[in-house]
């Protein structure tokens, strides 16, 4: 991990590392957090080896691009609000391009998942019960089909190393209260809707995604945090491949880490330590991440 004068490491997740000013006691005693996106890649609740070259920069670029367009309160520290110093000038050169300065929030233990299309674990559950997370769906749907309306299917955010757990909306009420649960659902569906509309204009489908929210410590405002609509948190498909002339597999060719998931599913039984990713899988995944950023942002 990179040593950075003036900052101290306080936490590492699967992909991101958190730092606070060296004078702060910790996350609860600071108004500024440096979030550094690494090149680590995770799947099936495991961090894999090797990482994906350039992934941290691509995730950060995409999150910043989306935060600027989604019209939702977010945890970024505006560049002009730090006294006597612009926010971007506080970011150490060693992690420039893969870092964000953010406000600390009281995070909710909920993964706010929105599905616009039936696929992944939702498709598996639908085949058994014709529902997803307790929400009944029409009969006769196939893998990759667009849902009549996007659905909100929350999950309990497990500690690092444990499995996230799909939960009912009623369970979210028990965890965070009825008012907060309702706001999380409303915000998640609204942000997904705005993001999906923007992406479709650029020839990309957001099949599903997950958001994380926290409460502002001073005002209590529910605020979008962590990453947003990245290749790690979302399934992205090429809109040009959705016509009937393509096979289901071709229609769902993704701009995300589905390549990694598919390779692991075919080469690992999910017991013990996952195998190292082959160079070809690493290169293909990096290429898809870059292609998405280029498609969406034009950069």
UniProtKB/Swiss-Prot annotation:
Keywords recorded for this protein, A-Z: ATP-binding, Ligase, Nucleotide-binding, Purine biosynthesis
Family: Belongs to the SAICAR synthetase family.
Keyword Protein transport in record: no
UniProt xrefs under NCBIfam families: PRK13961.1, purC
Enzyme Commission numbers on file: 6.3.2.6
Pathway recorded for this protein: Purine metabolism; IMP biosynthesis via de novo pathway; 5-amino-1-(5-phospho-D-ribosyl)imidazole-4-carboxamide from 5-amino-1-(5-phospho-D-ribosyl)imidazole-4-carboxylate: step 1/2
Catalytic reaction equation(s): 5-amino-1-(5-phospho-D-ribosyl)imidazole-4-carboxylate + L-aspartate + ATP = (2S)-2-[5-amino-1-(5-phospho-beta-D-ribosyl)imidazole-4-carboxamido]succinate + ADP + phosphate + 2 H(+)
Name assigned to this protein: Phosphoribosylaminoimidazole-succinocarboxamide synthase
GO molecular function: ATP binding; phosphoribosylaminoimidazolesuccinocarboxamide synthase activity
GO terms classed as biological process: 'de novo' IMP biosynthetic process
InterPro entries: SAICAR_synt/ADE2_N, SAICAR_synth, SAICAR_synthetase_CS
Superkingdom as given in the UniProt entry: Bacteria
Gene (name only): purC
GO CC terms: cytoplasm
Signal peptide: none
Class of this enzyme: ligase
């Amino acid at each position: 991990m990179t040593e950075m004068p003036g900052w101290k490491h306080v936490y590492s997740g699967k992909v991101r590392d958190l730092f606070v000013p060296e004078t702060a006691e910790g996350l609860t005693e600071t108004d500024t957090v440096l979030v550094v996106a690494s090149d680590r890649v995770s799947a099936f609740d495991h961090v894999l080896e090797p990482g994906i070259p350039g992934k941290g920069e691509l995730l950060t670029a995409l999150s910043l691009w989306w935060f600027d367009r989604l019209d939702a309160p977010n945890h970024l520290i505006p560049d002009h609000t730090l006294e006597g110093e612009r926010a971007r000038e506080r970011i150490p050169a060693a992690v420039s391009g893969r870092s964000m300065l953010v406000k600390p929030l009281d995070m909710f233990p909920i993964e706010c998942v929105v599905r616009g299309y039936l696929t992944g674990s939702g498709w598996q559950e639908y085949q058994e019960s014709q529902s997803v997370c307790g929400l009944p769906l029409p009969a006769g749907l196939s893998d990759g089909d667009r849902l009549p309306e996007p659905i909100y299917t929350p999950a309990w955010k497990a500690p690092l190393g444990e499995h996230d757990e799909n939960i009912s909306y009623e369970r979210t009420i028990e965890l965070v209260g009825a008012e907060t649960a309702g706001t999380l659902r409303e915000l998640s569906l609204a942000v997904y809707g705005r993001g999906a509309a923007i992406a479709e204009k650029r020839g990309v489908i957001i099949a599903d995604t997950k958001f994380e929210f926290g409460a502002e410590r001073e005002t209590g405002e529910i605020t979008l945090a962590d990453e947003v609509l990245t290749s790690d948190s979302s399934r992205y498909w090429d809109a040009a491949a959705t016509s009937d002339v393509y096979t289901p597999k071709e229609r769902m060719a993704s701009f995300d880490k589905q390549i990694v998931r598919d390779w692991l599913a075919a080469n690992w039984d999910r017991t013990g330590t996952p195998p190292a990713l082959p160079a070809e899988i690493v290169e293909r995944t990096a290429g898809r991440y870059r292609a998405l950023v280029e498609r969406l942002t034009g950069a």
